[in-house]
Swiss-Prot record:
Reaction catalyzed: L-glutaminyl-[peptide chain release factor] + S-adenosyl-L-methionine = N(5)-methyl-L-glutaminyl-[peptide chain release factor] + S-adenosyl-L-homocysteine + H(+); guanosine(46) in tRNA + S-adenosyl-L-methionine = N(7)-methylguanosine(46) in tRNA + S-adenosyl-L-homocysteine
Annotated residues for binding of S-adenosyl-L-methionine: G146, T147, G148, S149, G150, D169, W198, N213, E353, E378, N405, D427
Active site (record annotation): D427
Region of interest (RF MTase), residue spans: 1-308
Keywords: Methyltransferase, S-adenosyl-L-methionine, Transferase, tRNA processing
Name of the protein described by the UniProt record: Bifunctional methyltransferase
InterPro entries: DNA_methylase_N6_adenine_CS (IPR002052), HemK-like (IPR004556), N5-glutamine_MTase (IPR050320), PrmC_N (IPR040758), RF_methyltr_PrmC (IPR019874), SAM-dependent_MTases_sf (IPR029063), Small_mtfrase_dom (IPR007848), tRNA_(Gua-N-7)_MeTrfase_Trmb (IPR003358)
Highest taxon of the lineage: Bacteria
Database matches in PROSITE patterns: SAM_MT_TRMB
Enzyme class: transferase
Region (tRNA MTase): 311-524
Length: 524
């Protein structure tokens, strides 16, 4: 029995249409071209050609599979991704065009860091030579977690000849597929494929990029999904615990030890997950560098970088960090590390303390004002650890810490955003040639004034009399401030606690003085 191409396609289109296939005619053509191994164009110009019984029977078998809602790419065994055709089967997630945004972001980051920053947003249309020709020869190490078919890893290798990739997957069946795809595109010498549950079997080494399209669908969303996806794609690549967020928690908790100092994490997310995923990474001490949208305008890929704890500013006076202190800095500090993203949409009053020492005043202010947010700056890591200890003991959480130099944070704080600033007993830098190092100087006063809201308060305290009165003179000459307590500099501000430093000053016959300022309306 023979039948024409036209009749075969017509009958198949009708059957596919009846079960709700969105593009029945196209899918009928794809199945038939797969059987006869000819391009679709051949079918269209040879509609009257008669096919023999063997080919008709082969076509009917494939059509029967599609009529059961098996994805057409599993039937044909291939799927295009980033202008290349990848081998796929039921053991790997079907590559989606949305995931191409992730590949674009890697290329853009590499291009920017290589000295070609002209592309500000990933362009879904640029491919291949557009990137490799613009990038320098910097050697790249990339880790992909949960590689599946390998479409991400292999696309990166094909476009970046100076890259090596380690690709992991928990499924041995998936690993067979990525090996086939790596061989197909001749990149086996630059890819190491590891059977691993996330980071478990990865030797300690450092990567420029960690990338992943992890499972991110909540189990509660199954009822909303297509039959093709639910019944045929591997559930381990689709669904995750913790409302679909489990993988993001795991990556946030473990990735830092595998990143180079300027390394990046680039992750695909569900289109409703931007807020939840960014919060996970903020809580674990990462910067949110950029969020990228897919062609439908949904947030699809996020670029993260770790907030590196720069300990070079720490003053090791007396003794080095204890084991308890190191544990606090390593395990508790990331949650409370300052980043500008944490101030976005902040509705509470916000106060900044510069140089909080051992943190007695800082913690007391946070305790007495639980509905406000306190940001603390301190380069002395023993003091940072002590704040974390005191906060844990008193269940205080309304604070952020920046264990680094003041000048590195000022540009991160928005103008007109602070309700108050505390500068208590800063280093006076007595010698004339050192005075430019003072926290309270003309240049910084201008910056601090810009950050304060109108009517916001700035409190300055010092036990060095010359410094204190020089500060008053500085205010009178350069600041848009009103001195509230000009008749009584000995009286501290509200909720002040006498710190150990204050006590030492009194024992040394030095008198602590306080200047309480109100920022008056002026130009920012």
């Amino acid at each position: 029995m023979q039948c024409s191409i036209k009749q075969i396609l017509s009958d198949a289109t009708d059957k596919l249409n009846k079960i709700g296939i969105s593009s029945p005619q196209l899918e009928a053509r794809i199945l038939l071209q797969h059987v006869i191994n000819k391009p679709i164009e051949y079918l269209l110009i040879n509609l009257d050609e008669q096919l023999n019984e063997a080919k008709i029977e082969a076509f009917e078998k494939l059509l029967a599979r599609r009529l059961k809602h098996e994805p057409i790419v599993y039937i044909t065994g291939v799927k295009e991704f980033y202008s290349r055709e990848f081998i796929v089967n039921k053991h790997v997630l079907i590559p989606r065009s949305d995931t191409e945004v992730l590949v674009d972001v890697v290329f853009q980051c590499h291009s920017r860091e290589s000295g070609n920053p002209e592309k500000k947003q990933p362009n879904p249309c640029f491919r291949g030579n557009d990137i490799s020709e613009n990038c320098n020869d910097k050697f790249l190490n990339i880790l992909e977690l949960g590689t599946g078919s390998g479409c991400i890893a292999i696309s990166l290798l094909c476009e970046l000849p100076n890259a090596n990739v380690i690709a992991t997957d928990i499924s041995l069946d998936a690993i067979d597929i990525i090996k086939s795809n790596a061989a197909k595109y001749e990149v086996t010498d630059r890819i190491q494929i590891i059977h691993s549950n996330w980071f478990e079997n990865i030797e300690t080494q450092k990567f420029d990029f960690i990338v992943s399209n992890p499972p991110y669908i909540a189990h509660s969303e199954k009822s909303e999904m297509a039959i093709e996806t639910i019944n045929y794609e591997p559930s381990i690549a689709l669904f995750a615990e913790k409302d679909g967020l489990q993988a993001y928690f795991l990556i946030a908790e473990n990735a830092k030890q595998f990143l180079k100092p300027n390394g990046k994490i680039i992750l695909e997310i569900g289109f409703k997950q931007e807020e939840a995923v960014t919060q996970i990474f903020l809580d674990h001490g990462y910067n949110i560098e950029s969020v990228y949208k897919d062609l439908q305008g949904h947030s699809r890929v996020i670029l993260f970088s770790p907030i590196n704890l720069n300990r070079s500013y720490a003053r090791r006076i007396g003794k080095s960090l204890s084991g308890v202190q190191k544990n606090l800095l390593d395990n508790k500090l990331p949650k409370y590390l300052f980043s500008k993203e944490k101030l976005v949409n902040e509705k509470r009053k916000v106060f900044l303390e510069i140089g909080f020492g051992m943190g007695e005043h800082f913690i007391n202010q946070a305790k007495m004002n639980p509905n406000a947010l306190f940001i603390g700056i301190e380069v002395y890591l023993n003091g940072v650890a002590n704040v974390l200890k005191l906060a844990g003991e008193q269940n205080i959480t309304n604070f952020l810490l920046f264990p680094n130099n003041l000048d590195l944070i000022l540009n991160e704080i928005p103008s007109n955003s602070l309700d108050g600033i505390y500068i208590l007993f800063p280093d006076p830098w007595i010698k004339n040639k050192q005075k430019k190092k003072r926290i309270f100087n003309k240049e910084r006063l201008k910056l601090l004034q810009d950050k304060l809201k109108d009517n916001g308060n700035l409190v300055f305290a010092s036990d060095i009399e010359n410094y204190f009165y020089e500060a008053i003179e500085l205010i009178q000459q350069n600041g848009n401030f009103e001195i509230i307590n000009k008749n009584d500099y000995l009286k501290p501000h509200d909720n002040y606690v006498i710190t150990k430093y204050h006590q030492k000053a009194i024992k040394a016959n030095r008198t602590p003085k306080f200047m309480i300022l109100r920022h008056v309306l002026g130009d920012h």
